[in-house]
């Protein structure tokens, strides 16, 4: 199923020097976001930098949201993860997409212009309405949490 999402190009290099975000394969869940920086950027160990992607989106449908997620190779090989762990893009947000890059390694990381640094995934959203109760109906789990079910 393909849902149309409005996309605004904020950096003219997108669509000319660098492709629009797209799914790499028919089974891809995410589209790569690129570092649309003006010059090479070095992220020191322990440092967090906000990196522009050169695009803005407007999801519009309140039944959807976008998530900005890390790319597995950057985290595993270089220690580059998202400073906020997951970026949530609400359906009514229309501003530029930025990526908070955190270098959790002990070596500097160099980000080149146009490098793929995160991925954009669209997910369904359910807005809940709370119902106040004095007690919950019992369940098998009850109040067990934080390791309650063990590791084996």
Curated annotation (Swiss-Prot):
Keywords: Hydrolase, Magnesium, Metal-binding, Nucleotide metabolism
Pfam families, A to Z: dUTPase
Protein family per UniProt: Belongs to the dUTPase family.
Annotated substrate binding sites: 71-73, 84, 88-90, 98
Enzyme Commission code: 3.6.1.23
Biological pathway: Pyrimidine metabolism; dUMP biosynthesis; dUMP from dCTP (dUTP route): step 2/2
BP term (GO), one: dUMP biosynthetic process
Protein name, UniProt field: Deoxyuridine 5'-triphosphate nucleotidohydrolase
Catalytic activity reported: dUTP + H2O = dUMP + diphosphate + H(+)
Disulphide bridges, residue numbers: none
Function: This enzyme is involved in nucleotide metabolism: it produces dUMP, the immediate precursor of thymidine nucleotides and it decreases the intracellular concentration of dUTP so that uracil cannot be incorporated into DNA.
Cofactor(s) named in the record: Mg(2+)
């Amino acid at each position: 199923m393909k849902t149309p999402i409005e996309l605004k190009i904020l950096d003219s290099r997108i669509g000319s020097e660098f492709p629009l975000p797209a799914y790499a394969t028919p089974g891809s869940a995410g589209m790569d976001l690129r570092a649309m920086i003006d010059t090479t950027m070095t992220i020191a160990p322990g440092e967090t930098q906000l990196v522009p992607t050169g695009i803005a989106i407007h999801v519009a449908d309140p039944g959807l949201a976008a998530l900005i997620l890390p790319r597995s190779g950057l985290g595993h090989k270089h220690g580059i993860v998202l400073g906020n762990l997951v970026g949530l893009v609400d359906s009514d947000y229309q501003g530029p997409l930025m990526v908070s890059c955190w270098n959790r390694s002990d070596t500097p990381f160099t980000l080149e212009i146009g490098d793929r640094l995160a991925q954009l995934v669209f997910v369904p959203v359910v807005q809940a309405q709370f119902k106040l109760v004095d007690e919950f109906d019992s369940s098998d789990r009850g109040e067990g949490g934080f390791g309650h079910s063990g590791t084996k």
